[in-house]
Design a protein with these regions (language model features):
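Short alpha-helix capping/helix-loop boundary micro-motifs
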Residues: 91-95
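Residue-level signature for short turns and capping positions that connect secondary-structure elements
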Residues: 35, 88-90, 114, 122, ...
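A short, N-terminal "cap"/entry segment at the start of jelly-roll beta-barrel domains
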Residues: 1-64, 179-180
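Short histidine-centered beta-strand/loop micro-motifs
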Residues: 62-67, 85-86, 96-100, 118-119
Length: 184
């Protein structure tokens, strides 16, 4: 990607709550960064060139969930959706952070951060990519209390910072921002 086209991602921080570990790392939302024409094929090629693997294509997933064993990236190639971050299934509605995404946007969700669609256009579609070598995601639904000694916290903390940012590569925000936080 041409350095002159760099766009700083939006950052959404969500702290641990009673039912979701969430993460010390912010969710990153890159606006209108996918190549045109924005379609499934071009989105897949673009995100996979930076050592992230495509593992599926989905529409809206309304069930609030998080992955304790891997980071996840959405490449939105069609439609739009309002997402919620940081709010688990047992949390009071409105406790999370909301963000609307649309075709051309990329979202990077750190391991442990609850996420779901709240509303979506009928044609909303995205690909899911994961750092190369990551295990198959496992979903938790934020329906039980997370205690200080919960094994989920150690599992999430053991997920490595990605080698590459899915949009900008080795020196991209997911690498630089998250490494700085982890080293702090």
């Amino acid at each position: 990607m041409d350095p002159s086209s760099f766009r700083e991602p939006e950052q959404y921080s969500v702290k641990r709550n009673a039912h979701c570990p969430n993460s010390q790392f912010p969710v990153l939302v890159y606006r209108n960064v996918l190549p045109t024409p924005v379609d499934e094929e071009s989105t897949s090629e673009f995100l996979q060139r930076n050592q992230w693997e495509k593992k599926g294509t989905w529409g809206a997933i309304m069930a609030k969930h998080f992955h304790p064993n891997t980071h996840e990236c959405y490449g939105i190639f069609q439609g739009s959706s309002e997402l919620v971050f940081g709010e688990g299934g047992a949390d009071e509605v409105g406790t999370g952070v909301r963000c609307t995404v649309s075709a051309g946007d990329v979202v990077v969700v750190p391991a442990g951060v609850a996420h779901a669609s709240v509303t979506s256009a009928d044609d909303y579609k995205y690909i899911g990519v994961y750092p190369e070598g990551s295990p198959k995601w496992r979903s938790e639904y934020g329906k039980r209390t997370v205690e200080d000694d919960d094994p989920l916290l150690n599992e999430i903390g053991a997920v490595p910072v990605p080698v590459c940012d899915p949009v900008y590569g080795h020196q991209g925000p997911a690498v630089k921002i998250w490494k700085a936080i982890r080293e702090f």
